[in-house]
């Protein structure tokens, strides 16, 4: 199964993620591809991590990218 990670920053980040998750076609595609990753909310400067690898989308808000990466299980290589 393909896994894709994408990163979005800027003021439109939340809107972009909403479009991805609210659009039925894209949501189906996201479930199929198991999207996960994080983006910076340009309005609050919070880091939002999202993980759909379990079949439904889990999201958490963090202060730092490092916290988001830890939640997602990234390993620095």
Question: What is each stretch, according to the model?
Answer:
Residues 5-6, 18, 24, 73:
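Glycine-centered secondary-structure boundary/capping sites
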